Curated annotation (Swiss-Prot):
Keyword Transport among UniProt keywords: no
Pfam hit, one: Enolase_N
Cell compartment(s), UniProt: Cytoplasm; Secreted; Cell surface
Cofactor note text: Binds a second Mg(2+) ion via substrate during catalysis.
Function: Catalyzes the reversible conversion of 2-phosphoglycerate (2-PG) into phosphoenolpyruvate (PEP). It is essential for the degradation of carbohydrates via glycolysis.
Annotated metabolic or biological route of this protein: Carbohydrate degradation; glycolysis; pyruvate from D-glyceraldehyde 3-phosphate: step 4/5
A GO CC term assigned to this protein in UniProt: phosphopyruvate hydratase complex
GO aspect biological process, one term: glycolytic process
Protein's name according to its UniProt entry: Enolase
Binding-site positions, (2R)-2-phosphoglycerate: 164, 340, 369-370, 391
Gene Ontology MF term list: magnesium ion binding; phosphopyruvate hydratase activity
Amino acid sequence: MENPFEITAVVAREILDSRGNPTVEVEVYTPVSMGRAAVPSGASTGTHEALELRDGGKRFHGKGVRRAVENVNKIIAPEIIGMDVTWQRDIDMLMIELDGTENKSNLGANAILGVSLAVAKAAANALGLPLYQYIGGTNAYVMPVPMSNVINGGVHAGNELDFQEFMIMPVGAKSFREGIRWVSETYHTLKKVIAEKYGKNAVNVGDEGGFAPPMKEVTEPLEVLIKAIEEAGYKPGDEIAFALDAASSEFYDEKLGKYVVGGKEYDRGELLELYRELVSKYPIVSIEDPFHEEDWEGFVMITRELGGKIQIVGDDLFVTNPKRIRKGIEMGAANALLLKVNQIGTLSEAIDAAYTAFRAGYGVVVSHRSGETEDATIADLAVALNAGQIKTGAPARSDRNAKYNQLIRIEEELEGIAVYPGKRFRNPFL
């Protein structure tokens, strides 16, 4: 009798992401199911991330992924066909071994991750389980508070804002569905407020669906957001709070050894003072990458100073890498991890990274990348981990809303059980 969980075929192809760049899509088949996954890609990338394999040359301006696709079809597929699709960790470890490098540069993290996620989906489908339940078990019931990136700066935008993301979090809502409604209403009010102040051309959207108006000072977006939240009928701070992603590796000047914000130079202490001022003046509950990816000392300082009051998130600092997360925990650098599956390259390692963070009392924010697809795996992953937080862009563009819509479905499925943590987003169980 045939084994319903045996992998019978693996197919990879090149598709387009939300920026029109190629990315890898993988399908994994068993006699009773199919799992399909598409791989995201980032614009502001940490130096220590697992390597995304690109072809180079003229085709797609060098961004083709035919090599990664071929690595799936010719190298990975023959090795995993015949294996049990529920052996997630064995399959992930086998691919890591096949690759043989620390940063997955041989086969490509985009090849390996595509297979890893498609395997999980095929297994969930074979068992007739939703993906969040397959990964997280029966205890997966915490809905994430969205961190919605509504104003863009940095490498995601064409304006002069140095901080990359100005986000809103509906911390006062009673459910995910209510929270996402608040975000949507605020987003549309924000569009009107920006158009009135900066003109109609200022409401074009960036990679993640946020607006990129011609702002320069870091306080400008925060003032505009306060106005939009109030005009939408909500209370800044109490109902809708702010989260920032400074992405400061992007504005750190190595030659000067200084951070350049709004044309002004700041050393570590001065930048910390700027954050302190912003946190005292505005309802900011989370700051991501406040210092550059090797400024461990800066992270330790801000965590000591502000970590009791707000969340300090490591993204480029940790790159979802358990070694770097452990170093941060030992030093007391940051108090939360930004979890991006494509930074590490397999589902098993991403889950390990999350649990390393949880065990140390760190928060975990499950995150998209700026180059996304209609794949909504991270919505299921956020619930599977009971992370309590998700970062997946503005409520605009189908690639972002695919995740929000999946979370609406999951909350409906978990009716009567689902918990929306609100202000307890960092430690949903406290």
